[in-house]
Amino acid sequence: MNYQGYIIYRERVRRNWSQAGLCKGICTVSYLSKIESGRAEPSEEILRLLLARLNLETNREVEREAAGLAERGWELLLTGRRGQLRGLLREGDIERYRAVPTWLDLALLSAQTPLEPALEPCMDVRQLAVQRILQRQEAEAVRLMPNAYTHLMLGIADYNAGSYSAAVDALQTAYDLAGREGAVRLMLEAKLFLGNAYCNRQDLPNMERHYRVGRRLAEDLQDESALRAIGYNTASAWIETGRYEEAYAWFSGQEQPTLMALHKLAICCEKTGRREEALRALTRAEAMDIDEIDRALALRLLQLVRYRLEHPDYLTRDDYGALLLDSFDRLRNELPLGYALFHLPWVLEWYKATRQYKKACELLEAYFPEKPL
């Protein structure tokens, strides 16, 4: 289907105009019907007149502007330079190009949610691949457009779903393809998620191997956010594997810790006998905002640590168990699997203390098949 035919139809219907009213003096009703349904390719003059009657701007200068913006946007997206892409699209008013076919490119490049399905017949393969990613159909996007970007998106989706073996395969493919294309940002992102996947499997040697490469890339790109993420995830893995003093050294050394970093610091202090420092970290965290996860859920996680610190007999208290299990269910249902995996030891501890051994086994078998036993 022709995009401009579609937009003429949509705008005419929105205004509640008849076909006869729109095309009067321009073309016949039957010809307009064919244009709207994509069965006819009208001349530039007829298109211009129909669009002008609908107050939709189009001329060669507008088309050139839109094409240049879209070309630059695709280059930035497919090489992982999302910050620059956001800046590029903020500078231009894409609605100005609504009557130009390239509007589809600009809309997809700036979209956070899928475009309406009725537009899909107007899309080319590249546009449709991005539409599928927005629809969370990443495997279909890879089939349509197998490149570093789509493999990265598939790997991230598999990672978030807890399918770590599949994630590793897709992310490694993304890294290799990005290396061939010189897409350094995609290489970095692939390495970060590869490290994350091995982190959640508590495979520290492979985690450190991927993070080591990721750290080099982040240093070369001067990406402080990526460096902090590597440090945070590595130290979190140390907590999961009982290396509390090493984790404490990292979390206590952060000059501007986030709420979740203070949560981890409090756990390190809890595990190493630094009770007062743990309580101070929790108090500080409770006053902070957070973008990473829902703040109410984050406060519940802080409350769990505080409860253990203030009630040494927490394993005998039903209200602790209720808070723990409810929070754990929210982590499983609302966030990437790594959050639940991190808190799994406390759930297993609770089940063991309350002699619910069957539930402990079922939890591991049903929800965490890749968790080392």
Question: Where in this protein do the model-derived segments appear?
Answer:
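Residue signature of alpha-solenoid helical repeat architecture, marking inter-repeat boundaries
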Residues: 63, 97-103, 108, 125, ...
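Short alpha-helical DNA-recognition segment
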Residues: 15-34
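Structural motif corresponding to the intra-repeat A-B loop/turn of tetratricopeptide repeats
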Residues: 79, 110-113, 161, 201, ...
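A short, Lys/Arg-rich alpha-helix, primarily the initiator
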Residues: 1-14
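Amphipathic alpha-helical segments of tetratricopeptide repeats
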Residues: 90-95, 172-183, 212-222, 248-256, ...
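DNA major-groove recognition helix of helix-turn-helix/homeodomain DNA-binding modules
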Residues: 43-60
